[in-house]
């Protein structure tokens, strides 16, 4: 496969999640066309960009995919067993569909390569950290990067609240702290993931035979979070509807979720030595005024105050802080597809000039 000698106009973006596959054709003007399947991709694809969740220590920048890169991605998959294997399958299928087009991997972990040692280092034995590469990598960086570009303030906190949830502290456009760690399981409670829990609790379950290793992993990944708390649904909008008719389990799940998000925002303010703006993005962050209000209700001591009318009216990009708020609060629609398409063009342009 030869690199294109002409400008890359149309990039097919392949975003493979743990349970979904999203395809979009992005043109040079940033217009995106949703594509139903690889087989139905329109003519004119110049290059293909792939979102890959975990790049490990090896990949800190987008990379042109070849057989050597694929082998290294296979090795990294053990660090993200729910996310990287679907990406690899999607890469294989896309390379088969477009064998004469360049394919570029863009990593969710790359934005967090700027984490300082005090944010990235676990308080574990040095032999484990050094021999096994145990450190905090951070995830959802492509989405966070887009939000940070839209709200370019010195001290920003980005709340990515989708099926996976994280809070990231961004100083002058660079990640300095984030809630996800070695894997995307750490941090906030999520749709079905537990987020951070007492490690001693997990040892207790294993030691006393209450769960096998596989059962424990399945429970932490698929049976916990909002679903485990409510026993109803992993979806914020469904829990809000249940709460509205008096379901106490739904109320508790949403209250815990909002409280943990707010705690992470406050911790991020410590990492940033202050706070200029908060961004809500992804799924519930973009579409749940109730969740945003719940989170910000905990943050008045930081000078955060919402405009209730603007908050209720905003489904998509918008400013929702009250005029009296000392902290800017914005909603930004996540556009990972545009970030990936741009990274593909930059990577291929650099490769053709080397």
Where are the regions that the model predicts?
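Internal helix-turn-beta structural module
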Residues: 251, 255-279, 285-354
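Short glycine-rich, Thr/Ser-proximal phosphate-binding strand/loop in the N-terminal lobe
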Residues: 10-43, 181
